[in-house]
């Protein structure tokens, strides 16, 4: 699937964009993408990456770091901004407000004006909570240079990832850090399952027919199982996604049971399918692309609305057909529906 996709896009770039350079298709796992970029659709033209520093700051006196240093499902990260000391106070305040919109409580930072002199050349509102050894370890970890600025974020995984991935994108664009014209990327090894926080039940991240990367892992922790699902990303935009499907009856049955589907329900809903698998099924998979989004990227436009003939409004109304509109009584009767008006 990936090989066919890569050949297809090499041809698209050559014939539509007249792009004759060799196209590089990068690959990154889902966990690596979250760890380095905070999202599963990074733009690799942007050199900014997150660095985990929980081990470095676990014993400092800064309460924000201490609160998350020992918590599960939490992160403490550092983000180096090249020549970030040139940012104004307003710039830093604007970035702080940006991450707050995504749940972050704030945005701590240190300025590395002269890294050879930690005592006087490194300044920060939180410096009094950090020893010189800790500061030096952070500088080494992110490979900071003179005039760089280092932002910090500490919170649960979701908030850190959501807020810092947006910050990476914003800073990369604002400071003109993007390198090259195109970034074509495969994101692989997505988790097979996730935990529904409301029901506390295991659910499929994609769908229950996605093949596990290693079927033997189904006997272990469901939340640690990787799948054979993949996304195709161009310049930080998800263009397509797909998976290799399950072709084994035994594996499919195990998946259903992990999802809490008992034998009776399994036979009622999927008996025909499991029976078909028992006769032998070749390995198979696929991918689906968002053509509208692809056109937007190829035309280097900022909004998908620009390439849709009759885009919906933000309230999902269609100005051309004036839909959605009310259904008449005959239409409702055909569907065995009735409307209930609010009193």
Regions found by a protein language model. Give the residues of each.
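Class II aminoacyl-tRNA synthetase catalytic cores and aaRS-like
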Residues: 1-343
């Amino acid at each position: 699937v990936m090989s066919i996709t890569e050949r297809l896009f090499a041809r698209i770039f050559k014939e539509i964009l007249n792009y004759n350079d060799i196209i590089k298709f990068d690959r990154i796992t889902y966990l690596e993408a979250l760890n380095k970029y905070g999202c599963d659709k990074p733009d690799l033209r942007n050199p900014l990456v997150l660095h985990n520093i929980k081990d470095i700051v676990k014993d400092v006196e800064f309460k924000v770091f201490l609160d998350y240093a020992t918590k599960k499902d939490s992160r403490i990260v550092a983000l180096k901004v090249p020549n970030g000391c040139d940012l104004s106070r307003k710039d830093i305040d604007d970035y702080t407000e940006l991450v707050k919109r995504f749940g972050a409580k704030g945005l701590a930072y240190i300025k590395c004006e002269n890294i050879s002199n930690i005592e006087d050349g490194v300044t920060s509102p939180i410096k009094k909570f950090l020893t010189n050894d800790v500061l030096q370890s952070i500088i080494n970890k992110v490979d900071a240079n003179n005039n760089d600025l280092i932002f910090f974020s500490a919170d649960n995984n979701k908030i850190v990832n959501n807020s810092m991935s947006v910050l990476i994108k914003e800073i990369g664009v604002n400071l003109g850090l993007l390198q090259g014209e195109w970034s074509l990327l495969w994101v692989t090894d997505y988790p097979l399952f996730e935990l529904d926080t409301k029901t506390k039940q295991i659910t499929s991240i994609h769908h229950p027919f996605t093949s596990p990367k290693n079927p033997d892992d189904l006997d272990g922790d469901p939340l640690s199982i990787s799948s054979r699902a993949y996304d195709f990303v161009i310049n930080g935009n998800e263009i397509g996604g797909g998976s290799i499907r399950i072709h084994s009856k035994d594996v499919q049955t195990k998946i259903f049971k992990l999802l809490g589907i008992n034998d009776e329900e399994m036979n009622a809903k999927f008996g025909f399918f499991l029976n078909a698998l028992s006769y032998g099924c070749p390995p198979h998979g696929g991918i689906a692309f968002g053509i509208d989004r692809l056109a937007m990227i190829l035309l280097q436009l900022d909004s998908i609305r620009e390439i849709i003939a009759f885009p919906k409004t933000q309230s999902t109304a269609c100005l051309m057909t004036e839909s959605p509109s009310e259904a008449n009584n005959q239409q409702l009767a055909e569907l065995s529906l009735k409307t209930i008006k609010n009193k």
